[in-house]
């Protein structure tokens, strides 16, 4: 059984952090032969999608005294081969954002993979449909007060009404470009103009949730069901808890409120073929739905002694 992973260059991944590596290790442990490729290596010929793929053998990380120990080298590559993606049991689309033109074109290629032979996850159509900031807006009962606009006056009014707000670019990742806005800040107009490219680019504004100081919970969902969570806590003067911005991680429980949020999302996630998802929850409110390359599995496994990748593969092969 062969499984393909469409990823960023393998040497750029961090095996002690990247969920893609955890999934590849789990697939290998389950007896699958793992192959890797990149979006630039896709080909359509006679209506069939091919890829230049490389088989990979991984040396799994080991948990020692609460930390991941990484073997060196941690992977070994075989010979490059061109293969139709229809010959794989599953194809994981795990290319990191941004969702740019090249990314979108790759999803159109993946539309041609035969669903009778191969599961593509997440669904290419679902990836196009689910902007990671805006997808949450359909679930109005579980999100904080939110607007999306490029209009400076509307943004100023929202900040004035809330007192404090968080501005998010619609295409960012890892906390990039997120700003804390406060009524009365003399730099407010400048921050709005820069973020919206002088009113040409819409951004998201959400009410500031004081619970953010206590952490931003990442919950991993598999086919709509929560399977693990980790809390990401801001450090120093930083208001963002993202691991990419230096947030520290702590073990987290999946609460009844978290389960209610997941139940609210589950039908839409299943409808859109979004099988492996990471949602962000602050103070009992859904703030983002991460579908492109959600992370957090390594941190959850390290803090809880779990192996979520094994659970994912058991579902995939069932």
Curated annotation (Swiss-Prot):
Residue numbers binding ATP: 159-215
One CC-aspect GO term: cytoplasm
Pathway note: Sulfur metabolism; glutathione biosynthesis; glutathione from L-cysteine and L-glutamate: step 2/2
Domain ATP-grasp: 133-317
Residues noted as binding Mg(2+) in the record, renumbered to the chain: 288, 290
GO MF annotation terms: ATP binding; glutathione synthase activity; metal ion binding
Keywords: ATP-binding, Glutathione biosynthesis, Ligase, Magnesium, Manganese, Metal-binding, Nucleotide-binding
Lineage top rank: taxon: Bacteria
Pfam families: GSH-S_ATP (PF02955), GSH-S_N (PF02951)
Names of the cofactor(s): Mg(2+); Mn(2+)
Catalytic reaction annotation: gamma-L-glutamyl-L-cysteine + glycine + ATP = glutathione + ADP + phosphate + H(+)
Key word Transmembrane present: no
EC number: 6.3.2.3
Co-factor binding details: Binds 1 Mg(2+) or Mn(2+) ion per subunit.
NCBIfam families: glut_syn (TIGR01380), PRK05246.1 (NF003573)
Family statement drawn from the similarity comment of this UniProt entry: Belongs to the prokaryotic GSH synthase family.
HAMAP family the UniProt entry points to: GSH_S (MF_00162)
Protein name as catalogued: Glutathione synthetase
Species annotation: Thermosynechococcus vestitus (strain NIES-2133 / IAM M-273 / BP-1)
Organism ancestry: Bacteria, Bacillati, Cyanobacteriota, Cyanophyceae, Acaryochloridales
């Amino acid at each position: 059984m062969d499984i393909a992973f469409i990823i960023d260059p393998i040497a750029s991944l961090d095996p002690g952090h990247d969920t893609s590596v955890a999934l590849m290790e789990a697939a290998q442990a389950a007896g699958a032969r793992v192959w890797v490729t990149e979006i630039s290596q896709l080909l359509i010929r006679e209506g069939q999608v091919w890829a230049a793929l490389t088989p990979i053998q991984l040396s799994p990380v080991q948990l020692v005294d609460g930390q991941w120990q990484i073997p060196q080298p941690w992977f070994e590559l075989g010979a490059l081969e061109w293969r139709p993606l229809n010959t794989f049991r599953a194809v994981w689309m795990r290319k990191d954002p941004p969702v740019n033109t090249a990314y979108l074109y790759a999803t159109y290629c993946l539309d041609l993979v035969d669903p009778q032979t191969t599961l593509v996850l997440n669904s290419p159509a679902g990836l196009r449909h689910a902007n990671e900031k805006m997808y949450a807006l359909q679930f109005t009962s579980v999100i904080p007060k939110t607007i999306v606009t490029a209009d400076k006056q509307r943004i100023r009014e929202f900040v004035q009404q809330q007192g404090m707000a968080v501005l998010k670019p619609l295409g960012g990742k890892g906390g990039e470009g997120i700003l804390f806005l406060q009524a009365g800040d003399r730099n407010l107009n400048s921050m709005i103009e820069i973020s919206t490219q002088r009113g040409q680019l819409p951004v998201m504004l959400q009410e500031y949730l004081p619970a953010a100081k206590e952490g931003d919970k990442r919950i991993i969902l598999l086919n709509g069901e929560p399977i693990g969570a980790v809390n990401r806590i801001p450090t120093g003067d930083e208001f963002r808890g993202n691991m990419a911005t230096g947030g520290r991680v702590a073990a987290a429980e999946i609460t009844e409120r978290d389960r209610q949020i997941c139940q609210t999302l589950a039908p839409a996630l299943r409808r859109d073929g979004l099988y492996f998802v990471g949602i962000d929850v602050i103070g009992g409110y859904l703030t983002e739905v991460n579908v492109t390359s959600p992370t957090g599995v390594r941190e959850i496994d390290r803090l809880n002694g779990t192996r979520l990748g094994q659970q994912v593969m058991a579902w995939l092969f069932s």
